[in-house]
Amino acid sequence: MNDDSETADDSLAAPTDDLAWETTDTRIDYSCPGFDIRMDDVRLPDGTETDFHYVDEPAAVVVLPFTPDGDVVVIDEWRQAVGRTNRGLPAGGTEPDDDDYAAAARRELAEETGHEAEAVEPLVTVEPANGIANSVHHYFVARGCEPSADQNLDFNESIRPTTVGYDDLKRAVLAGEVRDARTVLGVLYYELAGE
């Protein structure tokens, strides 16, 4: 047996603070509904002073919702940034007073699809773009999802819910037909976790 005290998990740990940047000031450069652009004045480890801009947004929840029959509730949503309708999982930003992400996942599922879940379980939490944003996405698997009410969309959402077979969704992800990264990550992680 190796006498080294470093374990496999230790080798994956965050690097030591000698790589850290010191934030000397921070401010919002631009604000819009949903996110801000923040600018930090920073001092790099070698002493260089510069600024760093990034997207500053609230945590988000992403839901992989299964019906009692094992189908998945997905949404078709217009995405202005890419100029097309996008198929994906229900998702949305949290509210400032949200301290229960599972409850936020239930709320987003109901608002975007009109479905309620019998059970909601955490799947994974990720930082999807931590080089340019402070985003944190909390993924949940929802089971026993059934329509219960009308959608309650935000003013800037164009969403049509539908259901697809899970195997069809997985095939579409693997074939590159689903380009929404949140959906790709959710389906692939669900598969890797052996759910």
Locate predicted features.
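Acidic pyrophosphate-coordinating catalytic loop
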Residues: I28-P33, E127-H137
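Nudix hydrolase/Nudix homology domain
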Residues: M1-W21, T85, P122, N130-N134, ...
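Acidic, metal-coordinating catalytic segment for phosphate/diphosphate chemistry
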Residues: W21-V62, P68, E77
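Short, well-ordered beta-strand micro-motif
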Residues: M39-D41, P65, V141-R143, G165
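A conserved beta-turn-beta hairpin within the catalytic core of GNAT-like acetyltransferases
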Residues: A81-R87
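The catalytic Nudix box helix
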Residues: G88-L123, F140, N156, G165
